[in-house]
């Protein structure tokens, strides 16, 4: 299983989108500052996730969620 996820920083309120095959481990890495783009912005809470059968599907969805139109739709869905 592969996951696409959205995290919210409890420190600055920003959202971060990513993909992984181990959601629990990846959230832990974000929270202890082991990731390049979110280092220093934690702690984080998981606010959204989707599950896919392949890495390719998850990577495509992650890329799509990071585009302008889809990012705005996701913000509306999440109520932000």
Where are these regions (language model features)?
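GIY-YIG nuclease catalytic motif and its immediate N-terminal context
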Residues: 1-35, 40-42, 49-52, 56-66, ...
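A short, polar/charged loop-to-alpha-helix boundary motif
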Residues: 71-77
């Amino acid at each position: 299983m592969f996951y696409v996820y959205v995290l919210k920083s409890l420190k600055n309120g920003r959202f971060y989108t990513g993909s992984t095959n181990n959601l629990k481990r990846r959230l832990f890495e974000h929270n202890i500052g082991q990731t390049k783009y979110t280092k220093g912005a934690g702690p984080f809470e998981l606010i959204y996730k989707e599950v896919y059968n392949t890495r390719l599907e998850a990577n495509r969805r992650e890329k799509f969620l990071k585009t302008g139109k889809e990012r705005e739709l996701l913000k509306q869905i999440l109520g932000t």
